[in-house]
Structures are given as structure tokens and as C-alpha cells.
């Protein structure tokens, strides 16, 4: 004889409900383990034009490209008004070699981008003369869209104190 167990509809409904609840709770636990503090929220913010000096000392094309990207985006997000905003990059590190005229072919894409940003008044580029000389360059060896300043650190301080530029690294 075959032993068949029969459950009431009420018992089956309770079992199904418990299984569903257990599945939902388990899924919630898994999600909480992946994001135990929830997800970030976006704060919609409108930015006014800014005065900013970037202290640039990088040694790779990727890092220099990132600096140009950030400065360009800052200009865009703050209104890109050359009369109310000012973004100045002060170069005094390994990136100096990218701006040497003798390296134009090697870094053509980067230089075209930098020159375009200067030409369109998105930003200005200044280079430390002392650092350039340390790399073996004089002003005549550097691309014409770059302005040479006697000392990068002194220029950064001057821009902060005299022209109220915020400091960015």
C-alpha cells in the first residue's frame, strides 16, 4: 500500500507564504551585503564661475590628460565665462617635457588639446622657469601658448593671495 500524505489547503498556503517570505528576506540580506549603507544620492548643485589654480606636477600623458579633462569640465560646469572665471594650470614637474617644441610630434594630440583649451579661453597655462631650466629648456624651447613665470610655487601663492584663486592639486 502506498502511503500518501495529504495537506490541507490552509497548510499549503502557509508553507507557500513562508517560502516566499524566506526568499524575499534572503534576497534582502544579499543586497544588504553588497551595499550595507545603501546607495549614494546625487545632490543637484549649480556652480558659479570660479577662480582656480591647478598645481600640476605629473609624469605621464594619462595624468596630464586627466588634468586637462578636469579643468575643462570645471569650466563647463561653472558656465565657461572667461570674464567671471579663471582656470590657470601652473606646470612645474615631469609634464614640462610634453610642452617642449622638440617633442611636438611625440605629444601632438596632447598639445593640440592643450592649445585648443588655451585658444578658446577655457584655461591658461603657466610654466615654472626654474623647473623648465632644470629640464634643460628655456622659454624659446616651449610651445607658444604657454606663458613662463619665474617660479611656479611663487605664482601659485600669488594667484591665491592676490587674485583669490582656489588651490587644486
For each feature predicted by the language model, list its residue ranges.
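Bacterial N-terminal signal peptides that target proteins for export
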Residues: 6-20
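Bacterial N-terminal signal peptides
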Residues: 18-28
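Bacterial Sec-dependent signal peptides at the C-terminal "C-region" and cleavage site
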Residues: 28-34
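N-terminal secretory signal peptides
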Residues: 34-86
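Structural recognition of the beta-strand scaffold that forms the well-ordered cores
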Residues: 52-55, 88-91, 124-127
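Solvent-exposed coil/turn segments that connect beta secondary-structure elements
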Residues: 59, 92-95, 130
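Acidic helix-start/capping segments at beta-turn-to-alpha-helix junctions
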Residues: 85-99
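A cross-taxonomic marker for long C-terminal extensions/tails that follow the last structured domain
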Residues: 100-169
